[in-house]
């Protein structure tokens, strides 16, 4: 075996060991050897390298099954920090996490304007805040992940965001040049799907659909544990599937799109009156007070969600559909209405092979997904 091959094998072994330590901390060298199939000298050598790189440290002795007590190893989650930011139509939600995805700092900002220039200024201010407040660590800031609700191409450029009307914006390059760290731009629903897969309701599933219901509707698709982005990177725009070919015109240029009937914007529109302009929080409050008009609107909201979800289930046949929406997460009526509609329409052979679940991460799902994408890249680079 030549030197290049030896180096490659060492890096593969290092990656395998780091993955096991990350998953099973605290763990002994002997247990690592048993779980990976690597011999003890290889484990010892590669663990020493990981310790020199500040990725792993020893925490003392574990229980013995006979003989000397083993020295236990732990993944150093504080070796560096990652920024994940979710840019919505009218908000920015940002987090700073350690290498295990634990949130260390967070910040939420309401957007008075969603112009790209103003949004970028707020983004930079938020990132600066995280950097100045970030704890000391061997690797410092390892990267920044930002998601937006719209079309992202394979070069991670923002092609179009229907509800804030951004077009052809290279946010990645400008942020990367400013901070000199890896930057990742992703679709918001893809980021949410990844967040739920790594940390949330989809942790134990390999094939899931994540549905983000806010001003519009986006879906993130995970097939066999991998994000599916499509040929051009534009998969998941199911909010713009037609459910009424004679319906009203959508901001995307089409007619009768699903999100015109089943988004937060559609729900608000159905309840607005000339006398009073309701906020989304007003609807949540009225629902908890059992206001008849609001409950009827929520029933209808669940009905239209069920129509679209039936199409998604029949198309993808996932193990679970994870739904991110504050009303769905807090009020059972919408979920019940939706489940009823789906069960009456979905392809009968699907039976009980799927679950409809509210998000367990709520508004932090996309930001956590972006932070996790950054961490994955960092851990890959460390063992390259």
UniProtKB/Swiss-Prot annotation:
Residues within the DNA-binding region(s): 29-48
A GO BP annotation: D-xylose metabolic process
CDD domains reported for this sequence: ASKHA_ATPase_ROK_BsXylR-like
Gene3D superfamilies: 3.30.420.40, Winged helix-like DNA-binding domain superfamily/Winged helix DNA-binding domain (1.10.10.10)
UniProt keyword terms in alphabetical order: Carbohydrate metabolism, DNA-binding, Repressor, Transcription, Transcription regulation, Xylose metabolism
GO molecular function, a single term: DNA binding
One family name in Pfam for this protein: ROK
Keyword Chloroplast part of the UniProt annotation: no
Protein family per UniProt: Belongs to the ROK (NagC/XylR) family.
Its biological purpose: Transcriptional repressor of xylose-utilizing enzymes.
UniProt cross-references to PANTHER family, sorted A to Z: BIFUNCTIONAL UDP-N-ACETYLGLUCOSAMINE 2-EPIMERASE_N-ACETYLMANNOSAMINE KINASE, ROK (REPRESSOR, ORF, KINASE) FAMILY
Protein name: Xylose repressor
Source organism (scientific name): Bacillus subtilis (strain 168)
